[in-house]
Amino acid sequence: MKLKQSVEKEVRKHAEEEHAIGRECCGIIVKDKYIRCENISEEENSFEISVNDYAKYMKNDTLQAIVHSHNNDFHLSKEDMVGQIKTSIPWGIVNVVSGTVRGMHFWGDSLPVKDLIGREFIHGSQDCYGLVRDYYKKEKDIKLKQYPRDNYWWSNGGDLLSEENFKETGFYKIDSSELEVGDVILFSIRANVVNHSAIYIGNGEVLHHLSKRLSRREPIHIWNKYIVCFLKYKGE
């Protein structure tokens, strides 16, 4: 989502002002204008927009996006993901580091799919499962289920990328000999559960996105020892 320069300037100013007093900023974009909202959350590193502020613009179908700031990262929290899904409009995160905005990231299924190769890793949006979802949306016009999650969920007892969850999303297990372009491969990389997914793109290569790296295509044999299973989409 591309903001007008004047709108982006207002968002940046608000985020930096709130960061200076240890708060997250929050606001809404309406008719290409940024409107500041009061953060009524009592918790640090959290935000909440009052029901009245939200409803005033939502009822007229003029609300384009909800924006809030994070201190020192872009990564989506589980609450961010739940909130965006519930509102069905794009959300944006403003990353403030040492008092200065370092960038903005918008996400949501209504936005165009970004390039699949060379994207920055942002947990909850541009991560391994986000890449699988975007591949299926772009290449097959299929909308896969979203799973709200916290960062490093696998180290806290989570099992997001389980075979059961993929089955619920419309996949079934196949043998490696049946592997075709577009099939999904699940991995367990230095974890007790499946914590990575990739798409097979043919010629012995996968498309995937690891933490702290850009999304890329790589030979599958590099990751052979981490493979747990192969999955094919059949529809929900």
Residue ranges and their predicted role:
Residues 218-236:
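Glycine- and charge-enriched low-complexity intrinsically disordered segments
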Residues 92-94, 209, 233:
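Generic beta-sheet signal
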Residues 122-139:
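Active-site nucleophilic cysteine motif
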Residues 116-122:
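Second-shell loop/turn segments in exported
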Residues 150-216, 220-221:
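...with weaker cross-activation on analogous glycine-rich loops/strands in unrelated enzymes
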Residues 141-153:
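Short acidic alpha-helical/loop segments enriched in Asp/Glu that coordinate divalent cations
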Residues 1-63, 71-109:
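Conserved beta-strand-loop surface patch within small alpha/beta domains used
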